[in-house]
């Protein structure tokens, strides 16, 4: 089925913000091309949060634009602006500056030798101030200072009387140094302030003791854990609600209730390990054994399913029995955190592949429009901007409580929009049931690279749950990849009158499609056709599959009426996505990428995409995890050796399994055994495979990665697959830090030195010069 534009009203906002007549309200209201104020349209419940900019005066254009201006010209402008501001500041505070240097001794007319100064920084500063003062004296702006010997002596004596005796082992300051230090303390505000009392300054004004006002008992106590990666202040919101109010707000109808429904709830958890005093513990099926642990940790109330046997010894103050706790968990969490998604514009991205990269691109696009945008993906969680939260295992296994609590934290810290992955697994389990999505994005649908348990129809229906919520033509949008054969099914979900923006690489009838693209080892260039004009994009994201992700993000920008220049800038800002075909660039002559592909299908598609970049050779490092999916080990080797010129087998989280046993299983993919491989190694030479490709192995991953990188030559592409963004290695019971990306960067520092030393790294083991 072919689509041109699937919206019933195929009209978009123009680049200048003017619109043709249309009957629906866009997700983003029209705004000036030069404006950086973005307002997200909303239904009635959202209008108070996002005022209409049409009610205000039109925004003023900036003084100058940096579009098309070189970096050097930008720096020139900034320097000129800084000089102008400095001159204005001097004129404004002229008297203050003059009085500040009035007490400095006049500088001697003759300069001092460098040897005499001894390189003393403070002497240099004093001399500079004195020279400046002398200049003002010559200009008649200041009067010469009278001799200060008498006054200094008097002040010094007073200071000595107040200080009392000084211990012998401490060097005494001379009188002038004491005065200077006192004045410095006073000028810089370093004089001691009482922890208890306010004080009165020299002018008679009462000053508030900030240490007393914002002491250790203040609610904003300093804690590095409260800071994002960029060290912006991240404030943890506090919530509380009585149990009866929570049940009423969430519309949960209990089967029976015991205890005090007026008990105050200060948190909600369904994992007993995270319970704190005052929390409500929602005991889901399968976690009944953790009731006692939750009780010991201070849970004041419990919500449990009727199938669970509740012990009489529980010390909680209230017990609520419901039909199914899994069904009510999302509603309870959303109500407790005050429905945060209703006050943000939320973009959900579903599909089998491309979700993570697409979320990164959309986040960057929104921020290019001036919108504070959070992100929730399998790789990272961002409040907004580069304020990254450290949430170990949270993003990999999100639950309804975590989703709502993170959204509440984002909203509390000024986030205006949120882009999040909505995987079929999460949608099927109801983890996103209480998220109020505004835009639904569909990337693609395959079953080869997923852990979803169910039929193909169930898998497709799970993804379609996101689109079934697109019912409001004024607020909702659908963004669909029509190269996928399931596109029509997703378009038909929800209200058919909701506008749809389509994208594709093969179907030129899509609203967003490439007119031309060029792939290389280091960048991707694509010319994109859109209803609003043609975009020229240069991206550091490599491969054909990333063009799909770029098109999806562009389609979202078109759907919300974003200015074209913001779309381009937002997409181009994303140079790499952690562990997703991530380019490691140390200015070497060959490419190195790290990717998370750890399944036969994922590895096959990755290597096909790399081959399309036309490298001279592909050198692939791959391993298989221990105690997990032994059946895929031969397949991984077979695919790697068929689609790579050189393959290096290694370990990947062996756990309690012998790495050599894992490698033996992998070698069976080419009909070899470990004994046969080692027999070849007796002569330090491993013959080519039947297809002419080479195969090596090493059970230590760090060694394998560094050797593969050292093999790289101009025009090659080294592919390190399996871990991606994961920064650990599981060996036995130990979890040790390890990062493929850091190992690649480290190895690249020595490649030139190895080659200059005459070491032949094309073979394994390496050949020293004398053995060539």
Curated annotation (Swiss-Prot):
Keywords of the record: Chloroplast, Phosphoprotein, Plastid, Transcription, Transcription regulation, Transit peptide
Biased composition (Acidic residues): 54-63, 158-168
Record localization: Plastid, Chloroplast
Observed phenotype of the null mutant: Albino phenotype and seedling lethality under normal growth conditions.
Main location: plastid
Function: Involved in chloroplast biogenesis. Required for thylakoid membrane development. Seems to be required for plastid-encoded plastid RNA polymerase (PEP)-dependent gene expression.
Entries under PANTHER family matching the protein: MUR LIGASE FAMILY MEMBER, UDP-N-ACETYLMURAMOYL-L-ALANYL-D-GLUTAMATE--2,6-DIAMINOPIMELATE LIGASE MURE HOMOLOG, CHLOROPLASTIC
Protein name stated in the entry: UDP-N-acetylmuramoyl-L-alanyl-D-glutamate--2,6-diaminopimelate ligase MurE homolog, chloroplastic
Organism listed in the record: Arabidopsis thaliana
């Amino acid at each position: 089925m072919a689509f041109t534009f699937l919206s019933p009203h195929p009209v978009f906002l123009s680049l200048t913000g003017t619109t043709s007549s249309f009957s629906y309200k866009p997700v983003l209201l029209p705004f000036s091309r030069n404006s950086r104020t973005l307002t997200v349209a909303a239904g009635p419940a959202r209008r108070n949060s996002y005022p209409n900019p049409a009610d205000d005066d039109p925004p003023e254009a900036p003084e100058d634009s940096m579009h098309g201006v070189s970096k050097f010209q930008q720096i020139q402008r900034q320097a000129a602006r800084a000089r102008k501001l400095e001159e204005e500041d001097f004129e404004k505070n002229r008297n203050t500056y003059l009085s500040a240097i009035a007490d400095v001794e006049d500088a001697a007319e003759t300069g001092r030798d460098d040897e005499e100064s001894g390189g003393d920084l403070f002497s240099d500063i004093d001399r500079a101030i004195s020279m400046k003062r002398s200049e003002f004296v010559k200009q008649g702006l200041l009067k010469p200072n009278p001799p200060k010997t008498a006054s200094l002596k008097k002040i010094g004596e007073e200071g000595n009387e107040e200080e009392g005796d000084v211990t012998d082992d401490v060097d005494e300051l001379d009188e002038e140094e004491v005065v200077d230090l006192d004045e410095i303390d006073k000028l810089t505000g370093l004089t001691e302030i009482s922890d208890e009392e306010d004080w009165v300054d020299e002018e008679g004004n009462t000053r508030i003791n900030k240490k007393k006002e914002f002491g250790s008992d203040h609610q904003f106590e300093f804690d590095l854990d409260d800071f994002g990666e960029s060290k912006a202040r991240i404030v943890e919101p506090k919530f509380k609600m009585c149990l009866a109010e929570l049940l009423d707000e969430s519309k949960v109808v209990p089967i029976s209730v015991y205890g005090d429904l007026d008990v105050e709830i200060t948190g909600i958890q369904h994992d007993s390990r995270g319970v704190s005093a005052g929390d409500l513990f929602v005991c889901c099926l399968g976690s009944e054994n953790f009731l006692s642990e939750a009780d010991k940790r201070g849970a004041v109330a419990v919500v449990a399913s009727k199938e669970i046997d509740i012990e009489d010894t529980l010390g909680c103050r209230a017990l609520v029995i419901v039909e199914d706790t899994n069904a009510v968990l999302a509603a309870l969490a959303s109500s407790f955190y005050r429905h945060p998604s209703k006050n943000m514009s939320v973009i959900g991205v579903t599909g089998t592949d491309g979700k993570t990269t697409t979320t990164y691109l959309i986040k960057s696009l929104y921020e290019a429009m001036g919108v504070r945008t959070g992100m929730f993906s399998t790789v990272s969680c961002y409040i907004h901007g580069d304020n990254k939260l450290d949430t170990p295992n949270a993003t990999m296994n999100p639950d309804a409580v975590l989703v709502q609590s993170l959204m509440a934290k984002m909203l509390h810290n000024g986030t205006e929009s949120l882009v999040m992955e909505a995987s079929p697994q999460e949608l099927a389990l109801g983890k996103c049931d209480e998220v109020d999505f505004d835009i639904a994005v569909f990337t693609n649908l395959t079953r080869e690279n997923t852990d979803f348990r169910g039929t193909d129809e169930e898998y497709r229906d799970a993804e379609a749950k996101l689109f079934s919520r697109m019912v409001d033509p004024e607020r909702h949008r659908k963004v669909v990849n029509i190269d996928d054969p399931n596109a029509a099914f997703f378009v038909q979900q929800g209200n058919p009158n909701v506008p749809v923006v389509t994208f594709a690489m093969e179907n030129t009838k899509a609203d967003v499609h490439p007119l031309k693209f060029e792939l290389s080892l280091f960048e991707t260039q694509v010319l994109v056709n859109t209803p609003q004009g043609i975009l020229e994009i240069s991206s550091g994201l490599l491969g054909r599959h990333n063009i799909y992700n770029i098109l999806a993000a562009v389609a979202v920008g078109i759907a919300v009426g974003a200015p074209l220049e913001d779309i381009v800038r937002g997409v181009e800002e994303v140079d790499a996505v952690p562990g997703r075909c991530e380019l490691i660039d140390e200015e070497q002559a060959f490419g190195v990428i790290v990717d998370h592909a750890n399944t036969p299908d994922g590895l096959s598609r990755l290597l096909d995409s790399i081959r399309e970049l036309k490298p001279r050779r592909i050198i692939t490092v791959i391993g298989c995890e221990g105690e997990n999916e032994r059946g895929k080990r031969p397949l991984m080797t077979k695919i790697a050796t068929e689609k790579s010129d050189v393959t290096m087998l290694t370990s990947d989280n062996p756990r309690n399994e012998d790495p050599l046993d894992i490698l033996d299983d992998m070698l069976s993919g080419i009909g070899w055994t470990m004994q046969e491989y080692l027999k070849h190694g007796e002569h330090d030479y491993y013959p080519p495979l039947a297809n002419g490709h080479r195969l090596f192995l090493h059970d230590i991953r760090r060694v394998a990665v560094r050797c593969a990188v050292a093999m790289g030559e101009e025009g090659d592409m080294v592919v390190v697959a399996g871990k991606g963004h994961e920064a650990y290695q599981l060996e036995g019971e130990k979890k040790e830090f390890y990062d493929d990306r850091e190992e690649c960067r480290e190895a690249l520092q020595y490649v030139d030195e190895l080659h200059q030393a005459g070491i032949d790294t094309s073979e394994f083991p390496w050949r020293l010069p004398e053995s060539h």
